[in-house]
């Protein structure tokens, strides 16, 4: 009834691997980047040189029913499970998890961590609530029964994350003395908070690389990238950023902070790009109803700067009468309390591990 296949680059298995998400998700739910997945499976992705992928499928009555990839990094005692998809069938999932566990034990790995789709820089975490809402841009969407499948196979939650849902900002409904004072204090000290121009993107992306590499290095599953690979990986952001919602902070000619807020393209950026998609992207980029606060970082030694950076972003949100999402915050971090008065609810995500 069930058959587990570990494959390499065979066309049939690659096509079945890529097909499965379309069988599980509706068009409004799916967040599959098929071209990126294919490049990874064929070791042709810009990041492929950093890891080795081991690919698994499960067939039920000759039909593809589950999939995953185990990512291996040289010198790392952990194996990473990602690109996990499965029909709602606990026995099918058990077959896959059992095969993966046996592989990891055979190769002397100490634990399996996931979901991690090959890299920290691509996608990780599992969504555990608010499945009634359409995915927002960059959200790692999955079926609501996936957590149970992992837990049933002895995985345990090792990290928790939240995304804050902020209510609509308007000129009259929101004032925050804390961020106002922080902003004024930093400006008076000589800090410059500015939005880059699109033509400066090539310069700015290098500044952000240096900050992110330094500030995110203590995150679980973080792996450093070479600067040229980081720039290549994020080159498309040039076309989807609303640069008025990007903030860089300079102090004494040094870049000490950044704040990247994306228009909410939902899942429009996945799949085939046609005229309707391009039109939706164009409209959202000009004036979105919702924005996603995706990346924020402050150099050590500049305590409180994060709240100051938010001030000009909030002013833009008020002017546009938009809602916002503060995305993917490690639970307990100070960023979880940014603009606390406007938080209406929270999306929740987890990272899991299996000790071997």
Go through each PLM region and give its residues:
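Generic start-of-chain signal for non-secretory N-termini
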Residues: 1-14, 18-19, 26
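Acyltransferase donor/substrate-recognition loop-hinge adjacent to the catalytic core
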Residues: 2-5, 140-219
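Hydrophobic residues on conserved beta-strands that form the core of alpha/beta folds
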Residues: 4, 78-81, 193, 293, ...
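A conserved beta-strand-loop-helix scaffold within acyl/acetyltransferase catalytic domains
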Residues: 18-61, 66-76, 195-296
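Alpha-helical subdomain
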Residues: 46, 71, 270, 340, ...
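Short hydrophobic/aromatic beta-strand or adjacent loop that forms the aromatic wall/cage
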Residues: 53, 159-163, 346-352
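Flexible loop/turn segments at secondary-structure boundaries
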Residues: 64, 120-122, 171, 255-257, ...
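Acyl-donor binding region in acyl/amide transferases
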Residues: 76-154, 273-341
């Amino acid at each position: 009834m069930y058959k587990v296949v570990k494959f390499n680059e065979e066309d049939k298995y690659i096509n079945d691997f890529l097909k499965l998400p379309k069988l599980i998700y509706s068009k409004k739910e799916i967040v599959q980047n098929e071209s990126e997945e294919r490049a990874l499976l064929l070791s042709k992705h810009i990041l492929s040189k950093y890891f080795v992928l081991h690919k698994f499928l499960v067939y039920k009555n000759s039909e593809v029913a589950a999939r995953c990839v185990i990512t291996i990094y040289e010198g790392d005692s952990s194996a990473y499970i990602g690109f996990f998809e499965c029909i709602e069938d606990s026995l099918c999932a058990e077959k896959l998890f059992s095969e993966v566990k046996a592989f990891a034990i055979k190769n002397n790995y100490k634990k399996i961590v996931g979901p991690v789709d090959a890299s920290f820089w691509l996608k990780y975490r599992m969504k555990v609530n608010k499945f009634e809402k359409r995915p927002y841009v960059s959200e790692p969407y999955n079926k609501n029964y996936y957590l149970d499948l992992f837990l049933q196979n002895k995985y345990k939650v090792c990290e928790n994350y939240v995304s804050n849902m902020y209510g609509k900002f308007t000129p009259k409904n929101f004032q925050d003395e804390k961020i106002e004072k922080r902003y004024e204090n930093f400006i008076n000290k000589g800090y410059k908070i500015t939005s880059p121009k699109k033509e400066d993107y090539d310069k700015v992306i290098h500044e952000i690389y240096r900050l992110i590499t330094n500030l995110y290095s203590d995150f679980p599953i973080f792996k450093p990238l070479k600067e040229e690979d980081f720039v290549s990986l994020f080159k498309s952001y040039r076309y989807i950023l609303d640069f008025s919602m990007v903030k860089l902070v300079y102090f004494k000619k040094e870049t000490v902070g950044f704040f990247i807020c994306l228009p909410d393209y939902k899942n429009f950026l996945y799949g085939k790009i046609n005229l309707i998609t391009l039109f939706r992207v164009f409209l959202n980029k000009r004036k979105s109803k919702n924005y996603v606060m995706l990346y924020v970082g402050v150099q050590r030694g500049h305590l409180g700067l994060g709240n100051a950076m938010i001030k000009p972003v909030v002013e833009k949100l008020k002017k546009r009468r938009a809602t916002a999402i503060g995305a993917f915050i490690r639970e307990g971090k100070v960023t979880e309390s940014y603009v606390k008065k406007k938080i209406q609810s929270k999306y929740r995500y987890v990272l899991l591990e299996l000790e071997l």
